Amino acid sequence: MAAPTDIRASRDAGYWSQFAATWTTLLTYRYLGRVNPVLDQGVERVTMPLRHDMRDSEGRVMAAPLAIAAAESGGMHDDLYIPNPVTASLDILDDALGVTRVRVLPDTIRLGRTMGFSRSLIVDDDDPARVIALSSGTAISLGSPPPGYRPVDNPPLEVADSPDMPRLHQVFNICPLAGGEWQLPALGTGTASPDAALHLGPQHIALETAAGARMRREFGAAAPRIRHWQVMFVARGKVGPFVTRSELIDGQGGGVAVRVALLDSGNEQRVISSATAIY
């Protein structure tokens, strides 16, 4: 498999053709079914289906899919920026039982020359008055693309929804390790963003997989649901494999938290992201 190529090295004539190739190869949005009118042809609003693989064993919506649906980028999009996420925060208000599709209502708080601040409401697409979660985040721009952008023809993959469908961590080949941690394979074209770094999608999924597994080891089937999810993207994941490192913090007041770091084992164990999950 060819190694991902950093789009910033492309010359003007080939920039957008490389972007289209990267966008249509990236697995995150195609598999989860998330579409965006700025980036995808023929799309009117940001939506994503909610399937069985996006819920826990009790049918409650998970944090990673919602964070991917919102994909906070500080109000930046690839048409005018080369966005790189810095933080993502999510508060879940509703388990989304019975919801088949969510809609994201984005709001740019402030967009500067190189940094942006954004927030979103994630609602039931059939009943927008039903708020599922609140999302917010920040991002920086790694540069400015050349003119000539056009939305990409990138329809979602056809994924049949069923109770026995593969879990998201299985689709992204995130595997358990001895000691309770998890490993995401080396960077590939299916997991790389246009700047040839590990995309936010696999990071959210790997981090929440590790957090949820830590909770189940502690509480079994009685593990409470996730309420708050926060991720800091602290460095670009360039090599891999990527390995989690987690710790559970049991508060005396009844709350439980799990902190998870994702390390690039092929790049001197560099921490590339850090998550906090509150249950």
Question: What residue ranges belong to the model's regions?
Answer:
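Terminal targeting signals and extreme-terminal segments of soluble enzymes
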Residues: M1-Y279
